[in-house]
Design a protein with these regions (language model features):
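S-adenosyl-L-methionine
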Residues: 1-67, 78, 83-115
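Post-transcriptional modification and biogenesis factors for structured RNAs
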Residues: 17, 145, 188
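S-adenosylmethionine
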Residues: 110, 114-172, 178-179
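Short, glycine/acidic-enriched loop or turn micro-motifs at the edges of active sites
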Residues: 55, 79, 105, 126, ...
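Conserved SAM-binding motif I beta-strand of class I
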Residues: 71-76
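Core SAM-dependent methyltransferase catalytic element
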Residues: 175-188
Length: 188
């Protein structure tokens, strides 16, 4: 089977190719969605920790480091995707840490350890996949229980048909942008 790749599109690692895991088990962030996020928040990454929940290939975490984040994490439960993310991290450097495990268990612990403000990028598998019917509810509960003083921003990539609440715990919806079947909602 032919390898799939994505390219870092901006910053100091611009042009670097990263391996993608199987599209059977992961859903890579669309280029237009990735571009919109980094166009909006590129200059706010400095001095921040970026956590990519449901990390897949760790592309968003690598792009965040490329654009000035101090440290980045990608959390991935799928073993094959995790192995690919580890390979990609070797291309980026020690600032990109790949964590194997359940996002809902690992992310709060990673957030709690941080001394710098956190940008959390939630990119769960769309709920149309088997076994993921309650994934959005779990993501909302995860965000609701995070400490406000540690979180700078929560970006939530989701199916456009989903209407997220105006408030999730201490976090308020800043804006939402639609890209066909995918939307990005920002909370602070």
């Amino acid at each position: 089977m032919k390898n799939l790749y994505a390219t870092i599109s901006s910053g100091k690692f611009k042009g670097k190719k990263l391996l993608l895991p199987s599209l059977q088990t992961t859903r890579s962030t669309k280029s237009i969605v990735k571009g919109s996020f980094f166009d909006s928040f590129r200059y706010e990454l400095a001095g921040k920790v970026f956590i990519e929940a449901f990390g897949g290939s760790a592309l968003m975490a690598a792009e965040a480091l490329s654009n000035g984040a101090t440290k980045a994490y990608a959390v991935e439960i799928d073993k094959n995707a995790y192995k690919i993310a580890l390979q990609n991290a070797k291309l980026i450097g020690d600032e990109l840490e790949i964590v194997s495990g359940d996002t809902f268990e690992m992310t709060p612990a990673i957030v709690a350890r941080q001394n710098l403000p956190v940008i959390l990028y939630l990119d769960p598998p769309f709920d149309i996949r088997d076994g993921f019917a309650d994934v959005y509810e779990k993501c909302v509960n995860l965000a609701r229980n995070l400490p406000k003083d540690k979180i700078y921003l929560i970006a939530f990539e989701h199916a456009s048909h989903l209407n997220l609440p105006e408030n999730i715990g201490a976090f308020t919806l800043l804006k939402s942008k639609k890209f066909g079947n995918t939307s990005l909602s920002y909370y602070s």
